[in-house]
Regions:
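Non-heme Fe(II) oxygenase catalytic core, chiefly the N-lobe of the double-stranded beta-helix
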Residues: 53, 57-62, 71-186
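Fe(II)/2-oxoglutarate
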Residues: 1-60
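Short loop-to-beta-strand entry elements in the cores of soluble alpha/beta enzymes
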Residues: 66-68
């Protein structure tokens, strides 16, 4: 995909499409043209039916879904506590682990937080990353052999926010490099 192939008119046409609830029988409702699902209802649905509908919603429908109740806030809180402990340990050890967007030391980052969480607190790791709804959506879009990676980025007061960018696999590439990839991977 080349920059000159990107047309605002094409984006406007996609954005103008209306999501119809009747096309997605497993969805609970549509809000702001986005499908909203109830996690418990998806869990109780035939897995193949849920996979098909989610893949269709992501690929041919609005391209985004909301699944209410997918993540237990207490699990997120437990993982957040461990992540801040890891950041505190990094800072105490004099490791300035910043991001690509702010001056060193302004923001905090945990590279490979997936492994670091697993080592720091295996139970929290399993509860956090073993989410059945995230697995369902990931399998619907990527297939059963998807792989997870995770980083933690904290924009601290006074730190520069990240700018819109692509992470792996089309992350920090020149336009010429990106143009070599087919449209569907953008």
């Amino acid at each position: 995909m080349r920059a000159e192939d990107c047309r605002v008119e094409d984006l406007a046409a996609v954005v103008a499409e209306q999501t119809r609830l009747e096309d997605y029988p497993l969805a609970d409702r549509v809000e702001a043209n986005v499908l909203v699902y109830a996690a418990d209802a998806l869990r109780a649905t035939d897995r193949d039916q849920a996979l098909e509908e989610l893949a269709r919603a992501l690929g041919e429908g609005p391209g985004v879904v909301i699944i209410e109740g997918a993540v237990d806030p207490l699990v997120v809180d437990r993982a957040t506590d461990v992540f801040f402990d890891i950041i505190d340990e990094q800072n105490a050890a004099g490791q300035s682990v910043g991001d690509h967007f702010a001056k060193p030391g302004a923001n905090d980052r945990i590279w490979n937080s997936l492994e670091k969480l697993a080592v720091a607190d295996p139970t929290v790791f399993v509860d956090y990353h073993g989410n059945d709804v995230i697995d369902l959506v990931s399998t619907a879009w990527l297939g059963p052999a998807y792989q997870m990676t995770a980083q933690v980025n904290v924009v601290n007061p006074g730190g520069a926010a990240q700018v819109p960018h692509r992470d792996y696999h089309l992350g920090f590439m020149s336009a010429a490099q990106i143009e070599r990839y087919p449209d569907h991977v953008h």
